[in-house]
């Protein structure tokens, strides 16, 4: 198994691995931008694991590249009061950003990147 990390982004904690893509709530970056996450909770590399208390910001970095912005699936909500003629339907589509995890690396060590 390759290295993985548990990071906190957009108010959620996510398990991420190198070379895979994930969907986050809309991020303020353009398509193709590369950025790094600062809230890293846990990192597992090869045979060692490190847990932050609460974060590993100064030891590790996670590089991500924005692939695209898109709308998520449509969520439909139907409200009704029984025995009344009150009915209401509404819904929404969340704005999402798809990112590719390029590398999970220790700071100060040569970075390995994933080419896709």
UniProtKB/Swiss-Prot annotation:
One of its GO terms (molecular function) is structural constituent of ribosome. One of its GO terms (cellular component) is ribosome. Keywords: Chloroplast, Plastid, Ribonucleoprotein, Ribosomal protein, RNA-binding, rRNA-binding. Its main location: plastid. Pfam families: Ribosomal_L21p (PF00829). SUPFAM superfamilies: L21p-like. It is found in: Plastid, Chloroplast. It comes from the Eukaryota. Belongs to the bacterial ribosomal protein bL21 family. Part of the 50S ribosomal subunit. This protein binds to 23S rRNA. This is Large ribosomal subunit protein bL21c. It comes from Emiliania huxleyi. The gene is rpl21.
């Amino acid at each position: 198994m390759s290295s993985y990390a548990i990071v906190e982004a957009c108010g959620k904690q996510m398990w991420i691995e190198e070379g895979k893509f994930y969907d986050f709530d809309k991020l303020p970056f353009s398509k193709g931008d590369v950025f790094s996450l600062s809230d890293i909770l846990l990192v597992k590399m090869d045979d060692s694991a490190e847990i932050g208390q609460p974060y590993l910001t100064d030891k590790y970095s996670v590089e991500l590249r924005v692939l695209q912005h898109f709308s998520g699936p449509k969520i439909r909500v139907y409200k009704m009061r029984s025995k009344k003629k009150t009915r209401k339907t509404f819904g929404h589509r969340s704005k999402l950003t798809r990112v590719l995890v390029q590398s999970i690396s220790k700071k100060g060590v040569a970075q390995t990147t994933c080419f896709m």
